[in-house]
Amino acid sequence: PTDTDTRQQKITTILSTGDTSVDVIQINDEMSTAFKNTGWLEGLNDTVMTEDILDNFAVGYIEDMITSADGQIVGVPGYCGYLSMWVNQEIMDEVGIESIDTLDDFKAFLAAASEKEGRYGYGGSWEKTYVFNEIAQFVNMFGGDYYDWSNEGNRKALEFMKEMVDNGWTSLDQLADKYEQMNQKFIDGDYGVVFYWGTGSEYADAGMKGDDKIHMYKVPTFEKGSIFTDSWSYVLNSASENKEAAYTFLKWIASEDGEAASYNCFDRYPARSDVAETVVPEDNDVKAMYATYAEELEVHGRPMLPQTMEFISEMGTLFQQYVQGEISLDDFCAQAQEAVEANQ
């Protein structure tokens, strides 16, 4: 199923009922968080994700997203993706902004880009199940903790996102927008900067990707420099009756050859840094920026809880109420903390 909730329900049913008809499944971060401590997934520490290859993967992602409470790594990342910042260079040049490296730079660009009628400095995907990514990104940039809504960094992040609305730097029209709608507006020149996953294929297809058009930009440092990585990971159903064959397949997926094949077949950036170094061409516009992300920023998996989709939706609903002025920041923080505790 392509619908997020339906897909997760189907895979939950397969795993929770001990269905032996499926051996290996590829799951996203939301499902990894929901499943990793249930016993439904086979641990891979001694068979696949062994010490000799672990350092080639993003350690923060492995620890945050696919390691169970008892220390078992339950997945093999299929690719490496970042929630990158993308800018429209034409707009940067038009408004005379040369860099967006700090909070002050970011504000200056948003303000300048928003001066043109019908254009906003910042564009988002603020539909209730999508905006979670941006809330968490700003919380990290302001030095907060997504699980602790008494943290001052969290408050600063939410205040800033509301400030963007109040100053006309972003639009409440995007409250229903998912990535498809956001990207179309970005391509059309309606936004100056967005946060988005992937390598920009949508922009390339529209003829709008390039150093002088839309391109990836290093995430600015506010209180700290931080970025999220994501993946879909291959996991082994603990009820599988074909585990030896599955181990053979998963070892290949985790190997240099498997990661290279995944890149060549699916155009997904390799999860292994050593493979990325050798198979991704030097003229690939993403390669240098991904290396910069890995070397200069804190890299984490996204903050998620076992009741993942419920948590994401609840936080999105609260956020929409807050930016529309329906609840106060204090109310948001109190209810956000309740959501954290209720969905653990």
Q: Can you annotate each of these PLM segments?
A:
Residues 1-60, 94-101, 185, 190-193, ...:
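Extracytoplasmic "Venus flytrap"/periplasmic binding protein-like
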Residues 1-2, 17-21, 96-98, 163-177, ...:
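A local structural motif
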Residues 11, 106, 113, 136, ...:
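Hydrophobic residues within well-ordered alpha-helices
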Residues 27-31, 179, 196-202:
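Beta->alpha turn/N-cap motifs
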Residues 28-83, 107, 115-117, 134, ...:
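Hinge/lid segment of periplasmic solute-binding proteins
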